[in-house]
Regions:
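Sec-dependent N-terminal signal peptides of Gram-positive bacterial secreted proteins and lipoproteins
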Residues: 2-25
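N-terminal accessory/pre-domain segments preceding catalytic cores
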Residues: 18-155, 265-286
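Repeated polar recognition positions within modular binding domains
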Residues: 80, 171-178, 191, 242, ...
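Short, charged/polar micro-motifs that form catalytic or ligand-binding hotspots
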Residues: 86, 154, 190-194, 198
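Secondary-structure boundary elements
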Residues: 135-189
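Conserved active-site-adjacent core of cysteine acyl-enzyme catalytic domains
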Residues: 181-189, 195, 203-206, 248
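Hydrophobic/aromatic-rich core segments of domains that either
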Residues: 199-262
Length: 286
């Protein structure tokens, strides 16, 4: 039986598309090990989390909710009931939620949550990506990261940091849907090409780890950014700043030392390493 040429051409194009974006061999995260994959911290191959915020900021109640929440999300549960051990469930939940947000930028399936508190019990609902969507999204992001790994392979740390800044800032800020839950993870950045500060910061965090640069995620009520290490010191890094300016603008590199919201302190500030007052753009001379 002869196959129609149009059909054959379509099959070839589709096969190439899926291979290139989802199944092409990649280098992978250099920190990923079999031991880590068997740990409770493992979510996917994008990121190795040391769960810094869980280990350094949680009391017993917050730790309990953190474990409960992330376990439910990894299992794809859309709803759960959490029995709190002490009063003040909502505040405890928010602290745990924020810590997970910072510890796990690779958790692309988790878009948002809502909850009701009654009789020291939380009734929590999660908005999650579908399992297939999350699987394909993870595969796509792995392949996007691999391109950056190849581009930065022989770069100095300064060149790598500038590369990530330029790469992230080249994407568009989604002003139309800036409060959409779908924009709050790295998924929107890597698969749609648009995002908001949360997506930009999480994408930066994933990229930094995969190319050998140490960094932290930072957030407050209004914004999310990074602290990045350069020559043993930590500096403010906010690629969202770059999305608002042309690359030839004097303000383009403002994010190497400033944040979009004008503050450089976030939640859990007391557990971060000291942050330099000197702007990274001054150190880099850009």
């Amino acid at each position: 039986m002869r196959i129609n040429r149009t059909v054959l051409y379509f099959i070839i194009v589709i096969s190439f598309f899926f291979f290139n974006f989802y199944f092409r061999p990649v280098q992978g995260n250099p920190l990923m090990t079999g031991k880590y994959k068997n740990s409770s911290a493992y979510v996917n191959n994008l990121y190795v989390s040391d769960e810094f915020f869980k280990k350094n900021s949680m009391n017993k109640d917050e730790y309990y909710i953190y474990e409960h929440l992330i376990d439910d999300v990894k299992k794809g549960k859309g709803h759960s009931i959490i029995k709190c051990k002490t009063k003040g469930c909502s505040a405890t939940y928010m602290t745990a939620y924020e810590a997970i947000y910072l510890d796990h930028p690779e958790l692309i399936a988790f878009q948002s949550s809502s909850w009701k508190e009654s009789d020291n019990t939380l009734d929590v609902s999660y908005l999650l990506l579908g399992k297939l969507q999350a699987f394909l999204g993870t595969r796509r992001i792995e392949r996007e990261i691999s391109i950056v790994q190849k581009e930065t392979k022989n770069m100095t740390d300064k060149e790598k940091i500038l590369f990530v800044y330029n790469y992230v800032a080249s994407h568009d800020y989604d002003h139309l849907f800036m409060y959409s839950s779908s924009n709050q993870s790295a998924y929107s950045f890597f698969t749609k090409g648009t995002s908001v500060c949360a997506g930009f910061a999480k994408a930066s965090q994933l990229l930094f780890q995969n190319i050998g640069i140490k960094s932290y995620l930072v957030m407050n009520t209004d914004h999310m950014w990074n602290y990045v290490e350069y020559e043993g010191k930590y500096y403010v890094f906010d690629a969202t700043m770059g999305t608002g300016f042309r690359k030839d603008s004097n303000n383009y590199y403002s994010g190497l030392g400033e944040t979009t919201v004008g503050v450089t302190k976030g939640y859990f500030e007391n557990i971060y390493p000291p942050i330099e007052d000197t702007k990274l753009r001054t150190v880099f001379g850009v």
